[in-house]
Amino acid sequence: MILSIESSCDDSSLALTRIEDAQLIAHFKISQEKHHSSYGGVVPELASRLHAENLPLLLERIKISLNKDFSKIKAIAITNQPGLSVTLIEGLMMAKALSLSLNLPLILEDHLRGHVYSLFINEKQTCMPLSVLLVSGGHSLILEARDYENIKIVATSLDDSFGESFDKVSKMLDLGYPGGPIVEKLALDYRHPNEPLMFPIPLKNSPNLAFSFSGLKNAVRLEVEKNAPNLNEAIKQKIGYHFQSAAIEHLIQQTKRYFKIKRPKIFGIVGGASQNLALRKAFENLCDAFDCKLVLAPLEFCSDNAAMIGRSSLEAYQKKRFVPLEKANISPRTLLKSFE
């Protein structure tokens, strides 16, 4: 088995993945959302301190799953990029300690690659090559995944990420963090879903294949300020619905532009923000229109988790892509390349 560790942001997670058949044997996770909610976003120093507390607790649960028999573990895998430096280092320190004490090889995994492999948890075979939309609090990307060693970025955000924009809109409406499920519920509760959108679709007439949410976010801010004296629940629902609809339509329009160029046969959606049901439905319709197979990460594995890191590290294990402890380091940025 491979013991995998994830600590790139505000989720502490450990998992055990069986090498022979890619089955997830154990998966444990502690979310920090309640600790960061009062700040309206993740506080790096607080996240680091909580990882230092939570990772050892999760390791104890792993020990119970193994009946304290660590001989079943053949390698340690750790997310080392991209992410918050102060949280990545907490996971890396644990991984190094385990690798040294158990005399096991160390695998360094890219967090974005891990999200791609969230599509294949509990599956020995992958459906690569495929294209992937990754939407989360930190990223809005289209990736082309040819195989484990060839995953490249073909489109990214010029400013805020999709998930980050939901967090900021929720904060504008004084509704808390994380904003994704909060704004999604506002949209679901809105009673007039068929009216024309009140917010502009970003980059609608731009030839660039990219994402942008800052202009949409600013339009929401102006609407909130206009209604500030009477920002009741009905108005919040209206703003939430129209913002979500415009944000998703922007993803659809840009992805449609990509589809017309590349005509992918298989398209995946991953990342924490991919739990949004309206987004999933919109992409079902888009893929149907282009005769493209849609694959979705299971809801429980959309947000950051060690199971996806364990699954992706199986490929590295088979290729013996191990890293000496003295060369193991972290990076706040991904080293995945962009297509020219």
Swiss-Prot record:
MF terms in GO: iron ion binding; N(6)-L-threonylcarbamoyladenine synthase activity
Primary location group: cytoplasm
Top-rank taxon, per record: Bacteria
Residue numbers binding substrate: 134-138, 167, 180, 276
A single cellular component GO annotation: cytoplasm
Keywords, sorted A to Z: Acyltransferase, Cytoplasm, Iron, Metal-binding, Transferase, tRNA processing
Subcellular location: Cytoplasm
Comment on bound cofactor: Binds 1 Fe(2+) ion per subunit.
Binding site for Fe cation: 111, 115, 304
Keyword tRNA processing among record annotations: yes
Bridged cysteine pairs (disulfide): none
Keyword Metal-binding tagged: yes
The EC number(s) this enzyme carries: 2.3.1.234
Cofactor: Fe(2+)
GO BP annotations listed: tRNA threonylcarbamoyladenosine modification
Catalysed reactions, semicolon-separated: L-threonylcarbamoyladenylate + adenosine(37) in tRNA = N(6)-L-threonylcarbamoyladenosine(37) in tRNA + AMP + H(+)
InterPro entries associated with the record: ATPase_NBD, Gcp-like_dom, KAE1/TsaD, Peptidase_M22_CS, TsaD
NCBIfam families in UniProt: gcp_kae1, T6A_TsaD_YgjD
HAMAP family for this protein: TsaD
General function of this protein: Required for the formation of a threonylcarbamoyl group on adenosine at position 37 (t(6)A37) in tRNAs that read codons beginning with adenine. Is involved in the transfer of the threonylcarbamoyl moiety of threonylcarbamoyl-AMP (TC-AMP) to the N6 group of A37, together with TsaE and TsaB. TsaD likely plays a direct catalytic role in this reaction.
Family: Belongs to the KAE1 / TsaD family.
UniProt protein name: tRNA N6-adenosine threonylcarbamoyltransferase
Species name: Helicobacter pylori (strain ATCC 700392 / 26695) (Campylobacter pylori)
Phylogenetic placement of the source organism: Bacteria, Pseudomonadati, Campylobacterota, Epsilonproteobacteria, Campylobacterales
